[in-house]
Amino acid sequence: MRLDRYLGSRAQLSRQDVRRLVSDGRARVNGEVTRTLDREVRIFDCVELDGQVLQPGKVARYLMLHKPPGCVSATRDAAHRTVIDLIDEPDKDDLHIAGRLDFNTTGLMLLTNDGQWSRRLTQPTSLQGKVYLVETEDEIDPGCVEAFARGLYFRFEDLTTLPAELVLLGPRRARLTLHEGRYHQV
């Protein structure tokens, strides 16, 4: 929300009063005087007017968790243990997951209460690479490198994935970098 709108609604001031107070340097965001009416105010920002705290600013939390197999990448699930169940943190119900891993997949999970950050990280338009260390039972065919580079066609979804980078690390190990999250793409 813009600072002028926030102050108008929170302090019940007219637009004219808000403009005057802000231009006089009487508003602070995160301890710094701001004279910018259209400055974005987030739930994590501390907002003051004339030295009075209107919003203390919530602490943004970013957690890394190693997801074990047999655990669901979800905040709630009636049938299975979730990654949130693994955390012993206050206010863990405020957290959500940035990304997902399949039920029996292990790896790094990122959790946060900062929705804007997690959207930037996980939206397909960001093309943020997700790196997987893959171990297989059978040897990996070297032709898979080119197949991932072209993109894989999934008949059940009738789509071709974005190109991905597969680097062979051994006969049964590879590093795979994906730029989208398709079900069972790994």
Where are these regions (language model features)?
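Basic, flexible Lys/Arg- and Gly-enriched helix-loop patches that mediate nucleic-acid binding at interfaces
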Residues: 1-185
